[in-house]
């Protein structure tokens, strides 16, 4: 068991409650809705580093209904909490989402499996180039990656210590992303929303 897996296995319930209180789901859903992503009834989506399912739930809250979303995380307990949320949420059915325990650096999927990949606050736990390369591998050509990294800030400095991760500079994110993706857009969440205190968003298209 890795340190990251052990950490999130221990705090899954508390982490989920914190995310509900600070409104992350609504913030992500609002932006995803504005993107008008090319998600069709036969599309496959991956939420890489899904945690307790916040971004997956935001996707469905935004009105998207792909054929299937795979919610992948290294933490079994986080996936258990996520599965319970998927069961209880009115906008998601059991057939919509499949929780998968796995490692971001060795995704258990074939090359070019997904039309859209979402990842939020997960690449901070792995070497950035390796993580982006693996996400690019499973994404179809011209597919979309919605990348929500931690951005350098006072809040993220505190979170680095609390959650034992490494914040990548935005310059590093742009440079490394450019090896595999075209940067289509960069969204700054409003500072009035808690997600804006520590996160930003890049919209990327696989080359």
Where in this protein do the model-derived segments appear?
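A short glycine-rich, Lys/Arg-flanked "PGG" loop and its adjoining helix->strand segment in the class I
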Residues: 129-141
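A conserved beta-strand element that flanks and buttresses the S-adenosyl-L-methionine
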Residues: 118
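Short conserved loop adjoining the S-adenosyl-L-methionine
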Residues: 106-111
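Conserved SAM-binding loop and adjacent beta-strand
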Residues: 14-31
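N-terminal, positively charged/glycine-rich alpha-helical extensions of SAM-dependent methyltransferases
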Residues: 1-14
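Acceptor-substrate binding/catalytic loop of class I
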Residues: 157-172
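Conserved beta-strand signature within the Rossmann-like core of class I S-adenosyl-L-methionine
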Residues: 143-149
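Class I SAM-dependent methyltransferase SAM/SAH-binding core
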Residues: 46, 52-105
């Amino acid at each position: 068991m890795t340190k990251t897996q052990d950490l999130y296995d221990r705090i899954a319930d508390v982490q989920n409650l914190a995310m509900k209180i600070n409104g992350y789901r609504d913030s992500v859903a609002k932006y995803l809705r504005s993107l008008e992503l090319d998600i069709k009834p036969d599309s496959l989506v991956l939420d890489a580093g899904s945690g307790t399912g916040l971004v997956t739930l935001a996707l469905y809250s935004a009105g998207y209904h792909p054929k299937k979303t795979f919610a992948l995380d290294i933490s079994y307990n986080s996936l258990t909490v996520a599965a319970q949320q998927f069961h209880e949420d009115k906008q998601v059915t059991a057939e919509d989402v499949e929780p998968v325990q796995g490692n971001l650096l060795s995704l258990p999927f074939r090359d070019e499996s997904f039309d859209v990949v979402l990842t939020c606050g997960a690449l901070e736990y792995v070497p950035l180039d390796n993580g982006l390369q693996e996400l690019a591998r499973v994404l179809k050509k011209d597919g979309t990656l919605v990348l929500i990294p931690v951005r350098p800030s006072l809040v993220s400095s505190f979170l680095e210590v609390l959650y034992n991760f490494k914040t990548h500079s935005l310059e590093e994110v742009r440079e490394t992303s450019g090896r595999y993706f075209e940067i289509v857009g960069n969204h700054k969440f409003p500072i009035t929303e808690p997600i804006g205190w520590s996160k930003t968003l890049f919209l990327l298209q696989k080359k």
